[in-house]
A protein has these predicted regions:
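Short, helix-capping/interhelical loops that line the mouth of catalytic, cofactor-
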Residues: 111-113
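Short glycine-enriched loops at secondary-structure junctions
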Residues: 104-109
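Glycine-rich tight-turn/loop motif centered on a GG-T
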Residues: 115-123
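N-terminal pre-domain/capping segments
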Residues: 1-100, 122
Length: 123
C-alpha cells in the first residue's frame, strides 16, 4: 500500500472567516500545495463545483482531490433532508475519485458569529 499526502486549503484561505487569507488567490494555494510536495488537496470554498472544471484545475497543478468537508445541519433539519442536501457534494467527490467525506455538525456553531462569546454553550 502506498500513502499519499493531501492538505486542507484552510492553511491559506479560511472559508469560515474570509478575512483570514481572503486576498490569497486560489492559484497561490494550488501552486504552493504542489511545490511543497503534496499530491492532493481537500475541497475548499473557492474551488469550482463543476467536476470537469475542478478536475482540470487540480490536474494543471498535478494535484488530486483527496476529500471534502461538509457542514451538516442535523440539529435544524431531519436526516432525510440532510441526506438530500449533501448529495451534490457527494457526487462531486465521487466524480473526482475521492472516497473521503468529512462531515461536521455545525447547525449551532458560533465560531463565525462575532456577537456571541466563544464560551457560550450552543443551544
Amino acid at each position: 500500500m502506498s500513502i499519499r499526502f493531501g492538505v486542507s486549503p484552510i492553511a491559506w484561505i479560511n472559508d469560515d472567516m474570509p478575512e483570514l487569507g481572503g486576498d490569497t488567490p486560489l492559484s497561490t494555494v494550488l501552486s504552493d500545495t504542489a511545490e511543497i510536495g503534496f499530491t492532493g488537496i481537500e475541497l475548499g470554498g473557492r474551488f469550482p463545483r463543476d467536476p470537469a472544471a475542478l478536475h482540470n484545475l487540480l490536474g494543471s497543478y498535478g494535484l488530486d482531490l483527496v476529500g471534502g468537508w461538509y457542514s451538516g445541519n442535523l440539529l435544524t433539519q431531519d436526516a432525510d433532508a440532510e441526506i438530500a442536501a449533501l448529495q451534490p457534494h457527494l457526487a462531486l467527490l465521487k466524480a473526482l475519485g475521492t472516497d473521503v467525506f468529512v462531515f461536521a455538525e455545525t447547525s449551532n456553531a458560533i465560531h463565525c458569529r462575532k456577537e456571541i462569546p466563544l464560551n457560550d454553550t450552543p443551544s
